[in-house]
Amino acid sequence: MEVYLASAAGLLSWCGKWRKIPTPLAHPTLLAACGTDVALADSVNRLLYRQGRISTLPPGVKVLRCWRNQLLTLSSETNCLTLYDAHDYPLVTSPAGIRPCGCAVVDCQVIVCGCEDGCLHIFSLPDLREIAAYPVPGCPMRVAADGGVLTCLSLLSPDSPQTLLFRLCLTSGDFAPVALLPGWCGAVTIADDHTIWAGVGEQLLHFPLDSVVPDVQLGGFGLIRFLSCQQSKLLISDPWAGHCLLMDTTPPSAPRQLYAGECGGCCFASCRKGTLPDWKASLNEP
């Protein structure tokens, strides 16, 4: 199991030990694992790096996603979703909400959090044709998909921030609120056992299947922006607090600091040696 992290130190990888992966992007902010490849973005300087190529990104890119060997970007400045081919040439662009800031890919569909337009938008791939839009409470900002069921974080009140965690079935349109939580929307992901991990405000929460009460509730975070779950490991990137952490989820244990410093996107990828990192070893930043 290998971990990728976009950081102020560049693109970092952990697979038994830390190493820096040479790239021309000095300060990457977003990444996406595309099979054995990693797409890397510097959203501040509007640069994309993949397979040895540097391309220009639209302004305001908030999300980078892979679909097959192609790439998706979502911009909160242009309010557009864009699909790129295997050589990073833009194929098609579609309007998607107002200040959109979250999306998820499910088979041949991409779900976009329309944010200020109050809708979850469903687009078909590869033509990016909008096939449905579901009005939801508040401003939907984060979404994760588990088959045909979406799990979403929506901001209800920016003045005294409250976030609604809910589920939505794509086939029936059924809406099911899970919890109303204090704080800003951070991140949400679905574990292999179909349970929910969510970062809201200064908290990390876990909701068992079909439960509206969290069985894990950890505090002390800044604002978790990226979550990635694989097997019994949860990878956490908290840019506000300036660290990346990893925790065991079965049973849940206290998160271990994996990296200290300015950080952005993170994800798991297959480790070439097929070995798990020794998390009891020294976890100093590289």
Kindly give the residue locations of the regions a language model identified.
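A short beta-strand motif characteristic of beta-propeller blades
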Residues: K17-T23, G52-L57, D88-P95, R129-Y134, ...
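Repeated scaffold domains used in trafficking and secretory/extracellular systems
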Residues: A26-G35, P59-R68, I98-V106, G138-D146, ...
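Eukaryotic tandem repeat interaction scaffolds
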Residues: G138-D146, L150-L218, G222
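Blade-level signature of beta-propeller repeat domains, shared across WD40, Kelch, NHL, RCC1
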Residues: S237-P286
